[in-house]
């Protein structure tokens, strides 16, 4: 009996040591993961604009979101449905109009000088037997929200503006006197801490992270023939992903927004040809092919059409403002001339019949 009790105690001690060793082994990993989450939270809390927030949460493709905000017609470049809009993001989709509203609201609520009215008597600290008419004046004072809980909107520069008011004293012994009053006007504002603090002193709120969403980052863009695996937190081949074929992941791949011969220029917010043409050749605007321009002002004029130098084509509509030429015909303002041989043929005839 005593021997069995000793064996049980030994196994219990070994089990306790094993559990402690396992917790010590994973402790640094958990602390490191928690530290990463805290840093990410700090960055998100300190974001001062929608663009900065998207830059943090979607660091690889924030420029495209900026383009979508700037260009309202960007979403119409793709013929797919709204749920599969042209985007290189593999994260959550946002409606572009909603983002515009959020961005405008964010800008309006930033810490900045705002027009407000202040009571003159309280502002100047006058006695109760003196009052002003009008009693209040319009000035600019700092107001708005800061992006961190520990900061407040404070003025960094002040000017004094003069207001002409009636000063009245009681009991009334004379008529109201017109006096100049100087009132503080805030010209600069900034979010400043109220007191020195620890950089990580923000109150933490309890957030439960679902087991299936514990990747250190959100879904990422995967190469063609690969899909994002939320369990492995990485891109895997389609045959390795158990959900392959059961869910439409076409929106996670590089979209065919600009076609096979073009690419999206994030700085210019437009589709451009991947390979430019030599200077002596014209580039087709749709398929980016290079060709020699065979049309000219003269050839188009013979067809009774107008020459478009950018597309090297003869079209009915003028790309510039039209004006009447000396011949009485209407032509482009920059192309008000006709073929030389035609003018030569018209010359003698015009001299005979002025």
Swiss-Prot record:
One BP term from GO: induction of positive chemotaxis
Pfam families: CXCXC (PF03128), PDGF (PF00341)
Glycosylation sites: 155, 185, 287
Disulfide bonds: 111-153, 142-189, 146-191
Annotated Sequence repeat ranges: 222-237, 258-273, 277-293, 301-318
Annotated propeptide span(s): 22-88, 206-354
A Gene Ontology molecular function term of the record: platelet-derived growth factor receptor binding
Signal sequence extent: 1-21
Keyword Disulfide bond attributed: yes
Key words of the record: Angiogenesis, Cleavage on pair of basic residues, Developmental protein, Differentiation, Disulfide bond, Glycoprotein, Growth factor, Mitogen, Repeat, Secreted, Signal
GO cellular component: extracellular region; extracellular space; membrane; platelet alpha granule lumen
PTMs per UniProt: Undergoes a complex proteolytic maturation which generates a variety of processed secreted forms with increased activity toward VEGFR-3 and VEGFR-2. VEGF-D first form an antiparallel homodimer linked by disulfide bonds before secretion. The fully processed VEGF-D is composed mostly of two VEGF homology domains (VHDs) bound by non-covalent interactions.
Primary location group: secreted
Protein's cellular compartments: Secreted
Tissue note: Highly expressed in lung, heart, small intestine and fetal lung, and at lower levels in skeletal muscle, colon, and pancreas.
Keyword Glycoprotein in annotation: yes
4 X 16 AA repeats of C-X(10)-C-X-C-X(1,3)-C: annotated span: 222-318
Family indicated by similarity: Belongs to the PDGF/VEGF growth factor family.
Subunit structure: Homodimer; non-covalent and antiparallel.
Functional description taken from the UniProt entry: Growth factor active in angiogenesis, lymphangiogenesis and endothelial cell growth, stimulating their proliferation and migration and also has effects on the permeability of blood vessels. May function in the formation of the venous and lymphatic vascular systems during embryogenesis, and also in the maintenance of differentiated lymphatic endothelium in adults. Binds and activates VEGFR-2 (KDR/FLK1) and VEGFR-3 (FLT4) receptors.
Protein's recorded name: Vascular endothelial growth factor D
Naturally occurring in which organism (per UniProt): Homo sapiens (Human)
Lineage of the species this protein comes from: Eukaryota, Metazoa, Chordata, Craniata, Vertebrata
Gene from which this protein is expressed: VEGFD
């Amino acid at each position: 009996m005593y021997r069995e009790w000793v064996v049980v105690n030994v196994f219990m001690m070994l089990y306790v040591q094993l559990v402690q060793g396992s917790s010590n082994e994973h402790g640094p990993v958990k602390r490191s993961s928690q530290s990463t989450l805290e840093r990410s939270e700090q960055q998100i809390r300190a974001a001062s604009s929608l663009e900065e927030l998207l830059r943090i949460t979607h660091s690889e493709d924030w420029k495209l979101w900026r383009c979508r905000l700037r260009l309202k017609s960007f979403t119409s470049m793709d013929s797919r449905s709204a749920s599969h809009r042209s985007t290189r993001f593999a994260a959550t989709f946002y409606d572009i109009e909603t983002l515009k509203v959020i961005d405008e609201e964010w800008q309006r609520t930033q810490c900045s000088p705002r027009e407000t009215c202040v009571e003159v008597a309280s502002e100047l600290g006058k006695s109760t037997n003196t009052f002003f008419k009008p009693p209040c004046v319009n000035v600019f004072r700092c107001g708005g929200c800061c992006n961190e809980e520990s900061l407040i909107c404070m003025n960094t520069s002040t000017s004094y503006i003069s207001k002409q008011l009636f000063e009245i004293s009681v009991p009334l012994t004379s008529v109201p006197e017109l006096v100049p009053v100087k009132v503080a006007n805030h010209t600069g504002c900034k979010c400043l801490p109220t007191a020195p603090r620890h950089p990580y002193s923000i109150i933490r709120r309890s957030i439960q992270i679902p087991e299936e969403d514990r990747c250190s980052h959100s879904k990422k863009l995967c190469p063609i023939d690969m899909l994002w695996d939320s369990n492995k937190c990485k891109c895997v081949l389609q045959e390795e992903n158990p959900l392959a074929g059961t869910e439409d992941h076409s929106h996670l791949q590089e979209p065919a927004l600009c076609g096979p011969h073009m690419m999206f220029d994030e700085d210019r917010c437009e589709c451009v040809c991947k390979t430019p043409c030599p200077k002596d050749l014209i580039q087709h605007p749709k398929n980016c092919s290079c060709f020699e321009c065979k049309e000219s002002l003269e050839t188009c004029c013979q067809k009774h059409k107008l020459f478009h130098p950018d597309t090297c084509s003869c079209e009915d509509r003028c790309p510039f403002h039209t004006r009447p030429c000396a011949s009485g015909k209407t032509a482009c303002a920059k192309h008000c001339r006709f073929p030389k041989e035609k003018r030569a043929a018209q010359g003698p005839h015009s001299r005979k019949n002025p």
